[in-house]
Each structure stands twice: as C-alpha cells, then as structure tokens.
Amino acid sequence: YAATDSGRFDGTAVITPRSGAVCLRAELPAGVLQNAVAALPWTMAREEKLFMNGYQTWTACPELGKWDRQHGVERVPKFLLEKYSFDRYGDYHFVPYSGKRGQSHGFSYCYFRRGKTYRLLASLDEAPGYTIFSYDSRAAQLRIERDCAGVQHTGGSFPAFSLFFAEGTEDEVFDAWFAALGCRPRTTRRLAGYSSWYNRYQNIDEASIQEDLNGCK
C-alpha cells in the first residue's frame, strides 16, 4: 500500500524469487506522502544466511543466521561513542533496532544465501527515496518500505518500488542486477586505490602522505 495525507492505495502483485525486474506503482491523490510499504511472505531455512546491506554501506552488516540478533551501537562503550561519534556513521538514529532474534533491516539490497545459492532482492531506483528491507524470521515476512514520508506528491502515479529479484550463484544474481541497472565496468583491468583515512585519520601532512605513497611503489 501507499498513502498521502489525502488518500491511500492498496494493491497486490504476484512476486517470486525469479521475477526479475518488478515495478510497483500507486495511483495517489495529491498531498504529502506518508509511506509506501509492501509485505511479502518469505520463508528462510534454518541453515540459510541473510545479508542486509547497511545504510550507505557504513552501518555494520554481517551475514546473519535465521535467529541471530542485529546489533546497533548498544554494545559500544559510551565514552567511545562520545569521543568518536560511532553512532553517527550509520542509521542508528533514524531506524529502530528491535534487538530481537530473527529481526533485521537494511537498505537498497539484501540476499538470502543457502550454500552457494543466493536469493537476491534489490532496488533498481532510489531516486524516490531509499528502499528499506526488513525481515522477521518468526513471521516469515519480508517488509519493503520506501523512505518517502514528507515528500509532496502532485497526484497521479507514484513509483512505489522498482525492484529486482534473482536466484542463482553469487555471480549470476549480482551480474543480472548490474545488467538490469545498466551498470557496466569501465575496465576489466584490476584497479587499486589508496586512502589515508584508516591509517592516519585527520593527522595528515605532506610528509606523511609522501611516506605512504613511497610505500606503495
């Protein structure tokens, strides 16, 4: 469903792990968007692993078991939070963490992995707002939400979700997603990069950077 402060749209669609590209639109009256939500029945085997992509890939996002807990920053000592502001790097201040087993969330894409078989669910368009995936193992439900609350809608068709579903090996599902996005590698040559941040943080000057660059030769 999706809604503005002037009215609501409810609809259904048939979706499977092999559906490929799926576009869900909602006819809404003009007004301020309140939400856009889709709920899918989605079972997870006990031996499967779940990956939820962290907010802008900054939030901690390990693979989780079916009944694992997704942690925020509650285990980080308060003095470290105050000194380094670790709680500002991710979504910890605007997405609730239940702390319950089997409940997790992430942004833009997620996958369920059973051995070498992946079920990928991913967004094809984040322009209308971030796509937030949430999974509840106990309810066997995958919730998809568009971060669009507060946006003015002029009325008519709203692109609630533009999604991609694929099942196969890791290379198969991600290559298919990138192809659907029109994302092509700029080169097939292996590339390397350098950043001073994780070695020196803000303590940099010309001499320290030159030392690092000399070490890369």
Language-model features: where?
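Carbohydrate-recognition beta-sandwich/jelly-roll modules
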Residues: Y1-K217
